[in-house]
Amino acid sequence: MPNVNPAPIGVFDSGLGGLSVLREIRALLPHESLLYLADSKYAPYGEKPEAFVQARTLQACEWLLAQGCKALVIACNTATGHAVELLRQTLPVPIIGVEPGLKPAAAASQSKVVGVLATANTLKSGKFARLLASLDGESRFICEAGLGLVPLIEQGDIDGPDIRGRLDNYLTPMLEAGADTLVLGCTHYPFLSDTIRDMVGNQLTLVDTGSAIARQLARKLVEHDLAVAPGAVPQDRFVSTKDAAHLRQMAAALLHIETQAETVAIEPAPAF
C-alpha cells in the first residue's frame, strides 16, 4: 500500500546542478516530497580529491537520512562515480545515482562518434572507465573535461561570453572529429542546453539522463513499497551548506519556481 504520510526523497548535489534532476523528478512524481541538499560550501566536486568526494558524499547522505529521507538520489556525476557503491553498501535506503548517458548516445549516433562533456573527476572515475569499456567498439567517444563550467553555472551564467568561449573550446574538437551526439555528463550541464543548441544548431543531438533517473526512482519506490498515495500534497525543502539566498534565487532562475531555502551546517568536512 502506498504511504499516505510520505517521508521525503533526498536529492543531493555538490551545488545547483542537481536542480536539473529535481526538475525531472517533480515532473514525473508530482506528489512526492523532495529535500534538496546543495553542498555549495565545498562545490565543485569535479576537481576535488576522490577520497574527499567519497567521504563528504557519505557525510551528506547520512545527514539526509537523519532528516527522515526514504530514498536518495545522488544528483551529481562526480559523487556517483566515486561514492555510490560505498553508499549502497552502507546506507539502508534505495540509492539512485547518475551516470553519463553513453549507451543511449551510442545508440542514437549516426556517425558513431559521440562527444562527452563531463567533469575531470567523472572522466577519471573507475565507474566511467567501466562504462566506457562496456561500449568498446560501439562508438568512438571524444571526452572533454568541462573545466570552469560549473562555477559559472553556479553564478547563474548560462549564456554569457565566458561560458560560450569555454563551450566553443570543448565542442570544436568533437565536431571536427565528426561527433553528431553530445552526452551532458554533469547535472549542471542541462542548463546549458539552449546555449549549446544556439551555438551548434542541429549538428549535435544532446543526451541528458535526468528523465531516466526519475523513472528509475519511480521504479525503486514501487519496488520498496515507498511510493506516496496519489493526491498527497508534497512538502519540499531546499537547503544549502553555504548560501540559501543564492539557492533560492537560482531555483527561481533555472526552474522558475519560488521557494524558501535555508542554510545548514554539515561539519566537520573530511580532511584530505
Swiss-Prot record:
Pfam families: Asp_Glu_race. It catalyses: L-glutamate = D-glutamate. It is an enzyme of class 5 (isomerase). GO terms for biological process: cell wall organization; peptidoglycan biosynthetic process; regulation of cell shape. Substrate binds at residues 13-14, 45-46, 77-78, 187-188. One of its GO terms (molecular function) is glutamate racemase activity. InterPro entries: Asp/Glu/hydantoin_racemase, Asp/Glu_race, Asp/Glu_racemase_AS_2, Glu_race. The active site is at residues 76, 186. Its EC number is 5.1.1.3. Gene3D superfamilies: 3.40.50.1860. Pathway: Cell wall biogenesis; peptidoglycan biosynthesis. SUPFAM superfamilies: Aspartate/glutamate racemase. Keywords: Cell shape, Cell wall biogenesis/degradation, Isomerase, Peptidoglycan synthesis. Provides the (R)-glutamate required for cell wall biosynthesis. Belongs to the aspartate/glutamate racemases family. This is Glutamate racemase.
